[in-house]
Amino acid sequence: MVINKVEICGVNTSKLPVLKEKEMRELLISMRNGNTTAREKFIKGNLRLVLSVIQRFNNRGENADDLFQVGCIGLIKSIDNFDLSQNVKFSTYAVPMIIGEIRRYLRDNNSIRVSRSLRDIAYRALQVRDRLISKNNKEPTVSQIAKELKIPREEVIFALDAIQDPISLFEPIYHDDGDAIYVMDQISDNKNLDDSWLQNISIKEAMKKLSDREKMILNMRFFDGRTQMEVADEIGISQAQVSRLEKTALKHMKKYV
């Protein structure tokens, strides 16, 4: 059977059920009470979610059946770990876990590992790219980025290719005795980045769980690009307080992103 050019052996997508939010919640409650029939129905009712996710990996030359099986593992993990007490849609919670499971599978089955030095070059290249865009109001060429970094053009291309798989916004890329620097700090919002749609949905849902002060601090830090000291001056607290509030907010958000 074919769904948007993804072939899955043994899956008749035309007969896959579609569950409404209310029905999903009722099934989840029933599952928590040990109802195995409800669990099976819930899994079948969310297989379309897995199919929609694996379409994003179409161009990698991977076997769609394998990706589907791995995606189903991610779906089941999502079901087992989903917290009904949180006001979050199941799909919002499940999609990142399904994608994460597929990425782990791809990493584990890829003989090429991305070295620390390559990642460092890639992050520096992304920083330079953002700076040049801000300065010139247009996308820089790879040659321009390489010139800024004073390294060969081919090295920049190789490094950026090596981190093609999207990286978590909360992945620390540097930390000293002070605050960690996250990818979110270094890369501006870009609609063309892979999975930007997913990050946008997840971040919006996660931000709803924060206090007004936490929202304001994260908006100023990561969307307005201000330093912790600038935020502290703006809202009238110390830099240390900003740091603590920021870390607490990020910790809360990581539960949902």
Swiss-Prot record:
Motif (Polymerase core binding): 66-79
Superkingdom classification of source: Bacteria
An example molecular function term from Gene Ontology annotations: DNA binding
Keywords per UniProt: DNA-binding, Sigma factor, Sporulation, Transcription, Transcription regulation
PROSITE patterns hit by this protein: SIGMA70_1, SIGMA70_2
Cystine bridges: none
Signal sequence extent: none
Any GO BP: sporulation resulting in formation of a cellular spore
DNA-binding region per UniProt: 228-247
Xref: Pfam families: Sigma70_r2 (PF04542), Sigma70_r3 (PF04539), Sigma70_r4 (PF04545)
Function statement: Sigma factors are initiation factors that promote the attachment of RNA polymerase to specific initiation sites and are then released. This sigma factor is responsible for the expression of sporulation specific genes.
Similarity-based family: Belongs to the sigma-70 factor family.
Protein name, as recorded: RNA polymerase sigma-G factor
Encoding gene, per UniProt annotation: sigG
